[in-house]
Amino acid sequence: MKVVILNGSPRKGGNTEIMAETFAKAADKHEVEILNIAPMNIKGCLECKYCYAHQGECVQKDDMSKVLEILKDADMVVFASPIYWFDITAQLKTVIDRLYACGSTGFHFNKTALLLNAGADHVFDAAIAQYKAMTSYLKWEDKGIITAPNMVEKGTMKECPELEKVKELAKNL
């Protein structure tokens, strides 16, 4: 199975990257690719429907075409993000919005998971609700949601008990 992890964190070596890399290592029976989307040039969806008239091709010529090219062969997508202000990062949300282009052609992948971390323990609800609405509407199989609260400092994920849950999720695919 090909698994693509969309890392929405702009922070190199941060807690989200640690979660993503841990997942990738534990999913050693599968082909796993981590896409660090923050440094990519990806603009917001214009909802112009150009993609619907052109087999999923977007009118915007940016790095999203690279993301879509990689996702076309994926069997599973893992959305990984820190929570900065009650939701996933703007970078990851922009990629999710641009998946609109796949609405005309369909998605190859049908399995997903969500990895979240935050500096507090009460900020995950909006991101989880959005993810559940998306997976339900698109009939994607949710393989798991892992939240790691109180990750205030960079690197604290290394000592977080939820990291074991990340490993278990990846091993049990």
Residue ranges and their predicted role:
Residues G103, F107-I145:
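Short, glycine-/small-residue-rich phosphate/pyrophosphate-handling segment
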Residues M1-S81, F86-C102, G155-L173:
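N-terminal beta1-alpha1-beta2 submodule of the flavodoxin-like/Rossmannoid cofactor-binding fold
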Residues M19, R98, A129-Q130, N150:
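Amphipathic, positively biased hydrophobic alpha-helical segments used for protein targeting
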Residues Y131, T135-L173:
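A charged, well-structured terminal subsegment
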Residues P10-R11, G119-A120, N150:
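Short, glycine/serine-rich, charged loops/turns that create anion-binding
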Residues I37-M40, K111, I146-N150:
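A short, structured active-site edge motif that brings together acidic residues
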